[in-house]
A protein has these predicted regions:
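Catalytic-histidine neighborhood of serine endopeptidases
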Residues: 37, 100-170, 180
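Active-site region of chymotrypsin-like
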Residues: 73, 178-200, 236-313
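C-terminal cap/linker of serine protease catalytic domains
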Residues: 58-66, 120-131, 136-138, 220-223, ...
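N-terminal export signals
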Residues: 31-53
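Terminal peptide-recognition signature
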Residues: 72-77, 95, 105, 109, ...
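Active-site substrate-binding loop(s) of clan PA
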Residues: 66, 162-164, 180-234, 319
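N-terminal activation segment of mature serine protease catalytic domains
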Residues: 49-100, 104-107, 170-172, 209-214, ...
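N-terminal secretory signal peptides
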Residues: 1-27
C-alpha cells in the first residue's frame, strides 16, 4: 500500500532545511572570541584605573627631585640681635644663592625684606640715632646643609651678610655673605663653614607658557617654625602650582609697580618673600617678590622673571647701585 505524500508535512520538512545545523565547534569558537574580548576589555579597564596613580607617583618623584635640587641653593634670612628672643633671631624671609663663595657669595632676595639694612636707609639711620649698637644687630643668612631631606638643622651655618645693591622698582636686592656668624668680618672662610651654598642653576623665563608646572622653594611659615635649643631653626619648604600668568604688572610692598612679572598659583607666604620660583627641572625661573595685596592670596603670587634678573643682578653686583 502506497502512502500519499502529506503536503503540510512536506512543507514543514522544506522549512526545516532553512534552519542552520547545530555546530558545536563554531559555537566553541564564538565563546572563545567573546571570552578574549571580555579579557581585553577587562585589562583595558584595569589599565585605565591604574593610570592616575602611576602618573601621580611620577609627579611626586619629580617634585621630590625638584626640592632636593633647589633647596640647597635657597637660604633663610633673619635679623640677629643678642638681646632678642629665639636665640636672638627674628625671621625675615628667603634668598636665592646667585653665586657660590668662589664667585663672591652673592644672594638675591626681595628689597622690602632687607630695606632697613640698606646703606643710607631712614630706618638704619634711625637705629643709629637711637644709639643702638649696629655691630650687634646684624642681617644674617642661614645656609642649609648639603642634604636637606632628613638633615639635622644644626648642620646649617649662619653667615653675616651685607646689602650690596638694590632696585626698589623691581623689589630686588643683592646680599654678599661676609663671614660665618661670630667670626671677624672679612672674606668667607670656606674651610670653616659647615655648609657651602651652591648657586642655583638658571633656567629661562622667555619660553614659559601658562599652565607649566612651577614650584616655590622658600623658608617655612614663621608661625610654625620649630625651635632648636631656644633658637630659631629655619625649615625649607616647597609649594607647587603652575604659571598662571605672564607679563603682569602688580603693586609692590614698596609703593611701586613691578612690571613684567610672572604669576603663579603656588602659595608664597611672607616668609618666602625672595624665594626661588623653579621649573620642573629645578632651575630658577624667577624670584618671588610679592602677593597681591597685604595678605596671601591663593593664585596671586608674583615673581621677577630670571631673564630680567640676568640684567638686574650683575649691574647691582658690579656697580653697587642703591635705587
Amino acid at each position: 500500500m502506497t502512502l500519499d505524500s502529506d503536503p503540510e508535512h512536506d512543507e514543514a520538512r522544506d522549512v526545516s532545511r532553512d534552519v542552520p545545523d547545530f555546530d558545536s565547534r563554531r559555537l566553541g569558537r564564538r565563546r572563545l572570541a567573546l571570552g578574549a574580548l571580555g579579557a581585553s576589555l577587562g585589562s583595558g579597564l584595569a589599565l585605565l584605573c591604574q593610570t592616575e596613580p602611576a602618573l601621580a607617583l611620577v609627579d611626586e618623584a619629580n617634585a621630590t627631585r625638584v626640592f632636593e635640587t633647589a633647596s640647597r641653593s635657597v637660604v633663610s634670612l633673619a635679623v640677629y640681635d643678642p638681646n632678642g628672643a629665639n636665640g636672638g633671631y627674628t625671621p625675615r624671609g628667603t634668598g636665592v644663592v646667585w653665586a657660590a663663595f668662589e664667585q663672591g657669595g652673592f644672594v638675591v632676595t626681595s628689597f622690602h625684606v632687607v630695606k632697613d639694612f640698606v646703606p643710607g636707609s631712614p630706618s638704619k639711620e634711625s637705629d643709629d640715632k637711637k644709639n643702638r649698637d649696629a655691630s650687634q644687630r646684624r642681617l644674617r643668612v642661614n645656609v642649609p646643609a648639603e642634604k636637606t631631606n632628613g638633615a639635622d638643622p644644626r648642620n646649617a651655618t649662619w653667615y653675616d651678610a651685607v646689602v650690596v645693591g638694590t632696585q626698589r622698582a623691581s623689589d630686588i636686592a643683592v646680599l654678599r655673605l661676609i663671614s660665618p656668624a661670630g667670626d671677624v668680618e672679612g672674606d668667607v672662610d670656606v674651610e670653616k663653614s659647615v655648609s657651602r651654598p651652591a648657586a642655583l642653576q638658571l633656567g629661562s623665563s622667555g619660553s614659559l607658557r601658562v599652565g607649566q608646572s612651577a614650584y616655590v622653594v622658600g623658608a617655612g611659615d614663621v608661625k610654625g617654625a620649630d625651635s632648636l635649643k631656644g633658637a630659631y631653626s629655619p625649615q625649607t619648604t616647597m609649594s607647587a602650582g603652575v604659571i598662571s600668568g605672564l607679563r603682569r604688572s602688580v603693586p609692590s610692598k614698596n609703593g611701586t609697580t613691578i612690571r613684567n612679572v610672572l604669576q603663579t598659583d603656588a602659595e608664597i607666604p611672607e616668609s618666602s618673600a625672595g624665594a626661588a620660583l623653579v621649573d620642573s627641572n629645578g632651575r630658577l625661573i624667577g624670584v618671588a617678590v610679592t602677593t597681591y595685596g597685604n595678605t596671601v592670596s591663593p593664585g596671586l603670587g608674583f615673581a621677577v622673571p630670571v631673564d630680567d634678573l640676568l640684567k638686574i643682578v650683575p649691574a647691582l653686583i658690579t656697580l653697587h647701585q642703591i635705587s
